[in-house]
Amino acid sequence: MNKAILSFQNVTTMLTVTLINTLLAVTLMAAAQAAYAQAECTNRGDLDVLYCDENKDLVADTPKDAKRHKNPSTLVFTYTPVEDPAVYENIFKPFTDYLGKCTGKRVVFYQVQSNAAEIEAMRSGRLHVGGFSTGPTNYAVNLAGAVPFAVKGGEKEWQGYNVYMIVKKDSPYQKIADLKGKKVAHVQPSSNSGNLAPRALFPALGLIPDQDYKVLYSGKHDNSIMGVGAGDYDAAPVASDVFKRMAARGQIKAEDFRIIWSSETFPTSSFAYAHDLEPKLRDTLLKCFYDYRFPAEMRKAFDGADRFYPITYQKDWAIVRKVAEGGGEKFNSAAYENLKKKEAEALAAKQAQKK
């Protein structure tokens, strides 16, 4: 046989063996880390096996092993994709510029296109701090080691929002039960205002999602709102703060819609850091957030909020967890995989409509 062919086969064999050994080593390391985590953790609660909650505050503890602490030269920040991510990159620019000076690190804004992508980014270590929508915050805590610490707010309280059920102003619908058999847009499977809360609260009002109407996922709150305005949907449950911001920007006219139902108040998006940040960096980051006061353009964008108001997941997200549990929602790995599948299907359906 030709020596060149033999040489090529030998090289190929060596590369294959090396690849197999590498994959085996990675697999064994991951298994060892999981086993180590299980052996060292006395309480995990609802958290993924990668995390521990020994103080029972419902969020991941900082790793005991200092070798696992992260102190990146560049901090990656993002904000929930409730609307166009590019809009929020511009809105947060004064803050990210400040955060860079405050921490002494380069800060970049990472645009995410879905809640699942944002959660995955923190779980994989690519995201260090970010704003998570109200519902997805639960997944971020349990499956990505996110530690919520703030909500937009004022001097005395955090900023909340309501779930609005909106219809066109000239539609015949006057109450929730009138929407049986109609086209109702939900936002995303993980959205509190756009899916979880409606599923938990609507049955008592005479309307059962997926039974009295087929749930149509729009992908984002602005898609639902614009869709109702355009007549693509008969109604949609949306976050009141998004609706008000779109009206304030002139993207919609509030008078073109009617609100036929409004929920109790929920906290708006949480800001959370990765659980494995080096403690000194974490404390610096928290101080930077809490000391910051929003400039005029940010106050306008966020309905008058002027700061990051301190919260805890255990206390301030209790109402969100209660509503989700009332609707049968779980925030575990199986539910998350189902969430990713539904979000991917919703995105594909939306893209197909545009063609």
Named regions from a protein language model:
Residues M1-V17:
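N-terminal secretory signal peptides that target proteins for export/translocation
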Residues A35-A117, R299-K355:
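N-terminal hydrophobic or amphipathic helices and topogenic motifs
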Residues F77-G100, T134-G135, E155-M226, Y233, ...:
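Bilobed "Venus flytrap"/periplasmic-binding protein-like clamshell domains
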Residues T80-P81, E155-Y164, Q251-F289, R299-I319:
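Periplasmic-binding protein-like
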Residues R106-Q113, Q211-K220, R258-W261:
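Short beta-strand-to-loop elements that line the ligand-binding cleft
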Residues A116-G130, L143, A177, H221-D241:
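Short helices/loops that flank or line small-molecule/ion binding pockets
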Residues A140-K152, M246-I260:
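Ligand-binding "clamshell"
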